[in-house]
A protein has these predicted regions:
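Metal-dependent catalytic cores of enzymes that make or break cyclic nucleotides
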Residues: 28, 35-227
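Amphipathic alpha-helical coiled-coil "transmission" helices that mediate dimerization
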Residues: 2-39, 43, 50
Length: 227
C-alpha cells in the first residue's frame, strides 16, 4: 500500500514539475511577444522622428539606473523600463515639422506638444501590462508644484515611477542634441534639476540621479548623428 502511495506521490511530483516548466515556457513566450511589440512601436515612432526613438531608449536606461539606485524592486524597475521605452509614443500625432522645428514654437505648436501625454495614455490604456504604464506615461511631464502638464497634478499624486521618468527625461533631453540647439551637457542638466529640487522634481530622485552620474559614472550615450 505504501509502495502505491509513494508511486502516486512521485507521479504527482513529476506532473507538478512538468506544469512548472510549461508555465515557465509560456511566460517566456509572453515576455518575448511583449518585447517584440514594444520594439515594433518604437520603430513606428522612429520612422516619424528618429530623435524620439533614441531619446526613449536612453531615458529608459537612465530611469532604470536611478530606480535601482533608489532600491526599487525588480518588478518596479521593469515597469519603468517599459514606460521609458514608450513615454513619447504620443508624439506620433505631432506633425514632423513641429518636432524638428529649429525655431521658436508657436502657441499652437506647444499645445500639440503638451497634448502628447494624453495621446499616449489613450494608446496604452487598454494594453494589459503588468504595470500601470499608461498612468506613468501620462504623468511624466507633471511637476511637484502643479506647473506641469497635461493635468497639473501635484506632489505624491504623481506616481513615483513618473517622477523618476521626469528626471531622466530632463537629463537626457538637455544632454542631447535637439533640432533647435546643440547638447547643453549633463552638468547643465544636473544644474537644472538643482534649480527645481523639491519644487519641480522629487528630491530623492534627484539625489539618486546625481549619484549614478557623479559616483557611478553613468553617461548619456549619443550616436554619431546625435540621436
Amino acid at each position: 500500500m505504501s509502495h502505491i502511495s509513494l508511486s502516486a506521490a512521485e507521479e504527482a511530483g513529476t506532473y507538478v514539475i512538468q506544469l512548472e516548466r510549461e508555465l515557465e515556457t509560456t511566460l517566456k513566450k509572453v515576455q518575448k511577444s511583449m518585447e517584440a511589440g514594444i520594439q515594433a512601436i518604437c520603430q513606428t515612432v522612429e520612422t516619424k522622428d528618429p530623435y524620439v526613438a533614441g531619446h526613449q531608449k536612453r531615458v529608459s536606461q537612465l530611469a532604470c539606473t536611478i530606480a535601482k539606485e533608489m532600491g526599487l524592486s525588480t518588478w518596479q524597475i521593469d515597469g519603468i523600463r517599459v514606460a521609458g521605452m514608450l513615454h513619447d509614443i504620443g508624439k506620433i500625432t505631432v506633425p514632423t515639422e513641429i518636432l524638428s522645428k529649429p525655431g521658436r514654437l508657436s502657441h499652437v505648436d506647444l499645445a500639440m506638444i503638451h497634448d502628447h501625454p494624453k495621446v499616449a495614455f489613450d494608446i496604452l490604456k487598454n494594453v494589459d501590462f503588468d504595470w500601470p504604464i499608461a498612468r506613468i506615461v501620462v504623468q511624466h511631464h507633471e511637476r511637484l508644484d502643479g506647473s506641469g502638464y497635461p493635468y497639473g497634478i501635484t506632489g505624491k499624486d504623481i506616481l513615483l515611477e513618473a517622477r523618476i521618468l521626469a528626471v531622466a527625461d530632463v537629463v537626457e533631453a538637455m544632454s542631447s542634441n535637439r533640432p533647435y540647439r546643440p547638447a547643453l551637457g549633463i552638468e547643465e542638466a544636473l544644474a537644472e534639476l538643482a534649480r527645481g529640487d523639491g519644487t519641480l522634481f522629487d528630491s530623492e530622485v534627484i539625489r539618486a540621479c546625481e549619484k549614478v552620474v557623479n559616483q557611478r559614472g553613468f553617461k548619456v550615450e549619443l550616436s554619431s548623428s546625435g540621436v
